[in-house]
Regions:
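Acidic/polar, glycine-enriched structural segments that form the non-catalytic walls/loops
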Residues: 1-133, 217
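Short amphipathic alpha-helical leader/targeting segments
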Residues: 33-34, 155, 248
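Catalytic cores of carbohydrate-active enzymes
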Residues: 95-105, 116-117, 123, 140, ...
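Aromatic-rich carbohydrate-recognition surfaces in CAZymes
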Residues: 47, 54-75, 131-245
């Protein structure tokens, strides 16, 4: 009572002969208008000064909802086929069914929690978390799917973390915030100096895992200095006579 409730419905009228079957397809689509920041005139509280843009990656290709829907409709069969293509090798394997489902379902990280902006910077939101995004410890369990299938996206987030390495050599806990903005290479993250002990070790482990999966030594060497600084930070947290860093996690 006293509240305005909004809703919508889609209905289609048709006829069916006895025993006849028809398939009716609906497309649900929404469009994010591109939020453009006037960095010379907009108040500073409107955006994160040192961060990336507030657009979406599809803004590079589509300029209206109509264009986006037309593309989705015209390419629907190809998109369906190519989605099934990467799943086929899993479904046809000898893995147990529960594990097949788990592997395919790991893709949820991309379509429920990922931000990919117009520039191509990527980060993942761990959950509610008050808007905090790009959690390094969350990556340990969430990254294998997109590291394997979308290595460039995985590296985007890893590179922002590396660029945001703090003065002690520690990798930060977060690199973005839904209500402020996200970091970018060469910029600043809105969550500086926030870290837990496993963030730095987790970043190093994932960098090594990338090399193990891709064999890309050039990419690994690019961050050799960051790895060294991270290891020095972890050593600084090892009590005398103990080879394990001690701290909050």
């Amino acid at each position: 009572p006293g509240k305005t409730l909004g809703g919508s419905a889609v209905a289609l009228k048709g006829r069916l002969q006895p025993g006849e079957k028809k398939t009716v397809r609906f497309m649900l689509a929404w469009y994010y208008p591109e939020l453009e920041i006037d960095r010379e005139n907009d108040p500073l509280e409107f955006y994160w000064v040192g961060g990336s843009d507030y657009g979406r990656y599809f803004h590079n290709f589509f300029h209206s909802l109509r264009q986006l829907v037309r593309y989705g409709f015209a390419e629907r069969q190809r998109l369906r086929n190519q989605t099934f293509e990467w799943q086929r090798s899993i479904l046809e394997s000898t893995l147990p069914d529960w594990y097949k489902f788990k592997l395919i379902n790991s893709g949820y990280v991309i379509y429920t929690n990922m931000i990919l902006n117009k520039k191509g910077d990527m980060t993942v939101n761990e959950g509610g978390m008050g808007g905090l995004a790009g959690t390094m410890d969350q990556r340990l369990s969430a990254h294998p799917f997109y590291q394997k299938f979308f290595t460039r996206l995985d590296r985007s987030e890893m590179m922002i973390f590396a660029d945001a390495q703090q003065t002690r050599g520690n990798i930060p806990h977060f690199i973005g915030h839904y209500y402020f903005g996200m970091g970018t290479v060469g910029g600043r993250v809105p969550t500086e100096e926030g870290w837990m002990i496993d963030n730095t070790g987790g970043w190093i482990i994932q960098l090594a895992k990338d090399y193990e999966q891709t064999g890309d030594l050039k990419y690994l060497k690019r961050y050799a200095g960051r790895v060294y600084n991270g290891m020095e930070f972890l050593r600084s947290l090892m009590p005398e006579g103990v080879n394990i860093p001690v701290g909050g996690t």
